[in-house]
Amino acid sequence: MEEKKEFKKDQKRKDNKKPFKKAPTKTLDEIIVETKAVVKVTKGGRQRRFQAVVLVGDKKGLVGLGTGKAAEVSEAVKKARQDANKNVVRIPIIDGRTIPHEVVGVKGATRVIIKPAKEGTGLIAGGAVRSVLEIAGYHDITSKSLGSRKKINVARATISALQSLKTAEQVAEARGKSVEEILG
């Protein structure tokens, strides 16, 4: 019998594969945005599979989006969850409730406009935009989605919009000014 060699943490494998990446230790909340049946037509007939779109986040500025396909819905959701955990990004939240400025996100034919709102306004958003903003941890935002309403593209446009946000500190640093000069 062959003995299995144990690898040290920083030791490279002989087959040049990357070492297994551990799942994040934080537990993230999850929202299933969409599950749908998809069909591939072949000469042997129709092959039916399921596609799932899942959002994960910690409601403190972390958010990730993933998709998965499988023969069963539960397997598709599991794959989508794993994909979402790989695609987690951090986005800024001002005062634990809103965004610093208006922003527009585009994905395909979808445009999403997101605007900050006064305290107590609540989330004025629909569909996938609302899901992304809730899982990210926002409380006071207004939004409008234009063009295509395809859920995955709306979610991707929302995340791209949130990733393009800049804090006052980042703007001040880019302009070579102090934060007080930027805020007026």
Segments predicted by a language model, with ranges:
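Ribosome-associated RNA-binding proteins
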Residues: M1-G184
